[in-house]
């Protein structure tokens, strides 16, 4: 299976070609460092980059995440590094040794209770990584930073509360007059790349991302699958869990996801965060009956984000 087809159908679900012993190259032209390898994008990178027909590939891949390596990620042909990048000492100890890195893919983030805290924590995480790798990787050529559409819409706490630019949103629009950890990360990136001549960069700003990761804070597809499973288990109709505005508006996403079979019930203004209250036992029954990996409802459902996307005042819906 090729890298582009894997991406087109969802790399996480594809059965990808794995390296055989005699296929593994002795040296790699491209060496990727994926920060946040257990997230949706990081998990896909861990599958796609090592393929032989991936541009620049096959890549050697270092995958970094805070938690121990999960079983659903264990078959990816990468070198997994458990590292807390919010800890400068842990980051320097483990990442400064990666002297062969040519590309950094920074696809990690964490959520705090305020945007000021988001700026502080996420900025420190990125800075720790760059300061550990840039001085020690002589062949480092490019840094890819993933942020998102909140660059144009504002932080979660300000969605729908601040004046936005008129659409369409383009990369050269001035920043909004509000605190935003994406802006802070970009400033740190620009500051750090000046320390190495010839180092290039790119910033990617996707909107909703469809993919696989049980660890993602924003796994919309996974949450909807859990919602659908609970509806089926209880014999209830599968209604679209959002507003009419969210149903009708156009929205950019990185994979296709058909919702044609959903029904919209006029006047039912209940978000998934409310609907899923008290469903912990139902999910336990489903896990037992279907012999699924033991998880709690809280672990597999991100209801606040689903409500944000489909119902709870998302700024995107004002442009339907």
Where are these regions (language model features)?
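Active-site Tyr-X1-5-Lys
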Residues: 172-204, 212
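NAD(P)H-binding glycine-rich loop region in Rossmannoid oxidoreductase-like domains
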Residues: 69-128, 134
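N-terminal Rossmann NAD(P)H-binding glycine-rich loop of SDR-like oxidoreductase domains
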Residues: 3-4, 8-57
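NAD(P)-dependent short-chain dehydrogenase/reductase
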Residues: 195-248
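Conserved glycine-rich Rossmann-like NAD(P)H-binding loop of the short-chain dehydrogenase/reductase
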Residues: 53-70
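Conserved Rossmann-fold NAD(P)-dependent oxidoreductase catalytic core, especially the SDR/UDP-sugar
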Residues: 102-108, 117-181, 202
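Mid/C-terminal beta-alpha module of Rossmann-like enzyme folds, strongest
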Residues: 244-306, 320
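Amphipathic terminal alpha-helices
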Residues: 1-20, 56-59, 254, 258, ...
């Amino acid at each position: 299976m090729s890298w582009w087809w894997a991406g087109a159908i969802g790399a996480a679900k594809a059965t990808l070609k794995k390296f055989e012993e005699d296929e593994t190259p002795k040296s790699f032209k491209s060496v990727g460092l994926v920060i946040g390898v257990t997230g949706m994008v990081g998990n896909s990178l861990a599958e796609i980059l090592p393929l032989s027909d991936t541009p620049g590939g096959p890549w050697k891949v270092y995958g970094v995440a805070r938690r121990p390596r999960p079983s659903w990620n264990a078959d990816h042909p990468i070198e997994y590094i458990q590292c807390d990048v919010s800890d400068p000492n842990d980051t320097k100890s483990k990442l400064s040794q990666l002297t062969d890195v040519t590309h950094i893919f920074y696809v990690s983030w964490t959520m705090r209770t305020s945007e000021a805290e988001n700026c502080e924590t996420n900025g420190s995480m990125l800075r720790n990584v760059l300061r550990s790798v840039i001085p020690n990787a002589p062949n480092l050529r490019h840094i890819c930073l993933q942020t998102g559409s909140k660059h144009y819409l504002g932080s979660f706490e300000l969605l729908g509360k601040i004046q936005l630019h008129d659409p369409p949103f383009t990369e050269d629009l001035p920043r909004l007059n509000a605190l935003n950890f994406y802006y802070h990360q970009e400033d740190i990136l620009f500051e750090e790349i000046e320390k190495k001549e010839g180092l290039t960069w790119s910033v990617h700003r996707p909107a909703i991302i469809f993919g696989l990761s049980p660890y993602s804070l924003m796994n919309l597809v996974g949450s909807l699958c859990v919602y659908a499973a609970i509806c089926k288990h209880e014999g209830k109709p599968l209604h679209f869990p959002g507003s009419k505005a969210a149903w009708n508006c156009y929205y950019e996403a990185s994979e296709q996801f058909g919702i044609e079979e959903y029904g919209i019930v006029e006047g039912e203004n209940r978000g998934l965060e409310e609907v899923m209250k008290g469903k912990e036992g139902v999910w336990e029954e489903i896990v037992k009956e279907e012999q699924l990996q033991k998880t709690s409802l809280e672990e597999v459902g991100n209801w606040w984000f689903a409500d944000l996307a489909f119902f709870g005042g998302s700024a995107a819906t004002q442009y339907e």
